[in-house]
Amino acid sequence: MQRVTLTLDDDLLAALDALSARRGYHNRSEAVRDILRDALNQDPPSPESRRGYAVLSYVYEHEKRELASRLVATQHHHHDLSVATLHVHISHDDCLEIAVLKGDMAEVQHFADDVIAQRGVRHGHLQCLADD
């Protein structure tokens, strides 16, 4: 492991300490390592790490003009990426879907973009984890 020195503004250090306390980190280094891992996982994958896992979450209006059918068609079109999907009715009008995906990260990103771009889909978020 390498030792690195960081210079932080007082406000940023206070926010890091508050985050560390909330999450139960034993020291700042653990918190910074996790923050960096999260940031690196959000960065587009490099050519060396083209495969991995991802979680796609989104909310959609299930009665929006054929939206549910379009989403199912998109999922079936990319069936090779799907590991599992969780569907939750969060209100009379809205559903939350969480899809666990595995495969080529460019294809995963394309699938997520197709889903999130659908009219009626809100709060779309893709969390990627490239294979090490």
From Swiss-Prot:
The gene is nikR. Belongs to the transcriptional regulatory CopG/NikR family. GO terms for biological process: response to nickel cation. NCBIfam families: nikR (TIGR02793), PRK02967.1 (NF002815), PRK04460.1 (NF003381). The keyword Transcription regulation applies. Binds 1 nickel ion per subunit. This is Nickel-responsive regulator. Pfam families: NikR_C, RHH_1. One of its GO terms (molecular function) is sequence-specific DNA binding. Keywords: DNA-binding, Metal-binding, Nickel, Repressor, Transcription, Transcription regulation. Its cofactor is Ni(2+). Ni(2+) binds at H76, H87, H89, C95. It comes from the Bacteria. Transcriptional repressor of the nikABCDE operon. Is active in the presence of excessive concentrations of intracellular nickel. Homotetramer. It comes from Klebsiella pneumoniae subsp. pneumoniae (strain ATCC 700721 / MGH 78578).
